Structures are given as structure tokens and as C-alpha cells.
């Protein structure tokens, strides 16, 4: 997997950073860097660091939650995507980003994309990523992720 600080930087680019609770486009109560507190509640352990999140959190608190969410997504990708560990760091990141955004079960619905990646057809996998409701909803994020899948290089443009 890519370095934690790089994953944080990229996910802040894609998700944004909000220190007060807000409703995400899907209508869920969210805070920090895309932490959906309805489906992924703040744990007691996390509350010790972030405090009363309903009143807002610090940037450090948001990054703490994000690190936990990145580790969770990475663990789920390793568990549910058999070939994940064989991918280079950038393509692992692409799947991690999608898992972070969609949840592992949302990512697993991309069967054709995942199959293409498993057999090394990264151009085909990229096309499958872009030919989806996900791509229409997240726009430039999906373009970056698809390009990363195809080329094995992440670009901030």
C-alpha cells in the first residue's frame, strides 16, 4: 500500500475536509474526511481522541479518524479481493479509494473491473470503472482512479 500520508492527501482531495458534521450527497451525517457516522459510528476509543464530535472536531481529529478508515479499507480489500496483495501500490490505492467511497460491498459489485485487474487487463478495468454509476456520481475522482488503474500512476490533475 502507498504511504499513509499520501493516502491521506489523496482522500482529502477526493472527499474534502469538514470539521463540523454535515449531510453528504447521499444524505448521511458525515464529519472529517468522509466519515459516515451513521453507517460507521465513532467508536468509544475514537471519542477519546476526537471528543464531542457533534460539536465539531479538529483537523488532527479528522486525520485520526481518516487513518482508522484507511486501515479498515485496506484490511477489507486484503480480505475480500484475493489478488489485492499482488497489485502494485498505486493500483492497491485505486481499490482502497473506491472501497473508502463505496464500502467493500459496493466495490465488490465491480465484478468485471476486478476480473480485468486480476488478469492484468488494466485498460479494460479502467473502462469498466468509467462505465458506471459511480463514475457519473464522483466525476473527476473516477477519472483519476481509472487512470491510476490503467497506468499505475496517480495524477493530481
Give names to the regions the model predicted.
Residues 90-92:
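Acidic helix-start/capping segments at beta-turn-to-alpha-helix junctions
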Residues 1-20, 26-27, 35-39, 60-68, ...:
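Long, amphipathic alpha-helical surface segments
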Amino acid at each position: 500500500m502507498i504511504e499513509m500520508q499520501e493516502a491521506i492527501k489523496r482522500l482529502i482531495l477526493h472527499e474534502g475536509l469538514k470539521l463540523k458534521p454535515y449531510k453528504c450527497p447521499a444524505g448521511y451525517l458525515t464529519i472529517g474526511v468522509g466519515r459516515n457516522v451513521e453507517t460507521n459510528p465513532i467508536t468509544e476509543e475514537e471519542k477519546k481522541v476526537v471528543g464531542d464530535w457533534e460539536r465539531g472536531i479538529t483537523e488532527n481529529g479528522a486525520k485520526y479518524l481518516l487513518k482508522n478508515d484507511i486501515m479498515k479499507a485496506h484490511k477489507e480489500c486484503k480480505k475480500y479481493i484475493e489478488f489485492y496483495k499482488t497489485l502494485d501500490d498505486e493500483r492497491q490505492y485505486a481499490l482502497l479509494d473506491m472501497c473508502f467511497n463505496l464500502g467493500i460491498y459496493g466495490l465488490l459489485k465491480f465484478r468485471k473491473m476486478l476480473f480485468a485487474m486480476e488478469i492484468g487487463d488494466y485498460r479494460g478495468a479502467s473502462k469498466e470503472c468509467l462505465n458506471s454509476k459511480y463514475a457519473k456520481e464522483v466525476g473527476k475522482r473516477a477519472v483519476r482512479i481509472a487512470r491510476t488503474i490503467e497506468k499505475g500512476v496517480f495524477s493530481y490533475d
